[in-house]
């Protein structure tokens, strides 16, 4: 099990293959991604790499984290993430991770944060049909309707689908195929869409439910 990398979503584009089929691609950029630290089985109970990306002002880093970056002999990073690995896949601290960590034709899992929608009603958030447009219904056309039962239990159960905050959730999309890798521009072209807004950060790692192939 190898480490993943932290990348930045650039946007979407499309290309045509040899059959004339249009393929939607998401472009992610891998820039200044470095190994910050190690987590070992003997000391922490599991094997993992701590990966960081994007330089950060030293004045905005806490004193404990300053020492972590000083020990690694690298500049402070804005984004940090742990990736579980097998024992034989450790990489030296301060080593850089580039786009050639992945190859075209390989399948990957993408973890990202969805776009926040704010407070949303039940029709938008849960795809409810709403109430009738007429026949005695007034004011409450887009309401969710009844949420409880009677005096017993006399409450609304946790997890009930209702209006509330929508989006801004961590989501993992599995088995997305890498269309191409552009080492010169530091870009990975991934087939399909990826959660998150433009310039948001996401993690890319080998797919765990599909055997990757190189085309």
From Swiss-Prot:
The keyword Transport does not apply. One of its GO terms (molecular function) is structural constituent of ribosome. Disulfide bonds: none annotated. Methylated by PrmB. Gene3D superfamilies: 3.30.160.810, Translation factors. Pfam families: Ribosomal_L3 (PF00297). The modification N5-methylglutamine is found at residue 151. Residues 136-155 are annotated as: Disordered. One of its GO terms (biological process) is translation. The keyword RNA-binding applies. It comes from the Bacteria. InterPro entries: Ribosomal_uL3 (IPR000597), Ribosomal_uL3_bac/org-type (IPR019927), Ribosomal_uL3_CS (IPR019926), Transl_B-barrel_sf (IPR009000). Belongs to the universal ribosomal protein uL3 family. One of the primary rRNA binding proteins, it binds directly near the 3'-end of the 23S rRNA, where it nucleates assembly of the 50S subunit. Part of the 50S ribosomal subunit. Forms a cluster with proteins L14 and L19. PANTHER family: 50S RIBOSOMAL PROTEIN L3, LARGE RIBOSOMAL SUBUNIT PROTEIN UL3C. This is Large ribosomal subunit protein uL3. It comes from Rickettsia africae (strain ESF-5).
